[in-house]
């Protein structure tokens, strides 16, 4: 029997993991084993919100060394992370400045400035990327305006997964799927857009041409002396998660559920018309030249902050208590910028309810109920927008990632969207990371081939919509009110 051992490093905003995958060629079976899991989070440093990249690198190396200590010969390594954030290096490869996180406030107001100076439609036609106040385009502008003393020292700008690959291999790479999240890549050329780069203040020489997933960046030399290839996977974690989504047919949508919720569909062509612009739809790069037509939703970040502030450790107990409460008493817009990084999330949620003359969620369960109901309703709105954009309804929604373990939210989503939900796999980003490695090793033909492997090996759970649920009735009432207003307009 022929086995391949691939290691996926999957870094999220709240945690990271080093996972070992074992693929058996003859029976096309794939198993995952967690080698090392570690925390990630935001830090305050010199007035900025930052990432501790040294700690993350140490955790990555610890995980890789653990695999080697077991006597396992690694065939390849791949790294995926969140998007938009970057690390600056000088000519010697040493860091310049701080690895500032996207939740820092330094780019506040710059998105509106870019739209005014360059034109909102022109930016969108060039990049195809949604307008988010922390996109790399605005972060770089903030850097060059606020810290001009750093500019003479900068030789390279590496996005997060490329930085960690560089630290392992000494080789630089700019992977395409993650590069597209910057709002700096031209959607027609797949290269950096000179007009957008010029506005950002960044030097084009800081960047190399983006490479599509599947190339070998370089090699990591393990403690035993073996040279192990480090593969440029679809290094944006959502791009990897979509690869592992067992999408079946053109009427399947996906929801990558974690700190962020990313809802969308796959397409061979981007959508950059006025309808897409008005809905703030993004066209991020995917594997094999596909586009991830999607929309960002704030996701479980709100819950993570509530858990932290209220010091809640028993999430299953909280969900059980939440399930016993009536639905849709407290509704907020999770995508409101006020929730990006407030000083106190609980107070911010309560203030939003107070300002809209709603009851105030006080208990832990009420806050969680507010978040779950609000997310499910926003999922329904976004799914409707996506269906209108492409001119065809969806028949099923695949929820992948850590958030798909929340059975209450899965059912609320099915009920609010009125669509069958298939939950799983949980470790979608890790699996998609592994999938590209196996293709690079010539073990699999393409993404569709890999999805067949996922469908037969992953644990999937189906949630059927209940039209008689409270949230389904709430959605029906909203639609009825909207139709009445449209008729009277």
From Swiss-Prot:
Pathway: Carbohydrate degradation; L-rhamnose degradation; glycerone phosphate from L-rhamnose: step 2/3
Keywords, in A-Z order: ATP-binding, Disulfide bond, Kinase, Magnesium, Nucleotide-binding, Rhamnose metabolism, Transferase
Catalytic residues (UniProt): 237 (proton acceptor)
UniProt-listed GO biological process terms: glycerol metabolic process; rhamnose catabolic process
Binding site for substrate: 83, 236-238, 296
Gene Ontology CC entries for this record: cytosol
Disulfide bonds: 68-222, 353-370, 413-417
Keyword set includes DNA-binding: no
Name of the molecule in the record: Rhamnulokinase
Gene name linked to the record: rhaB
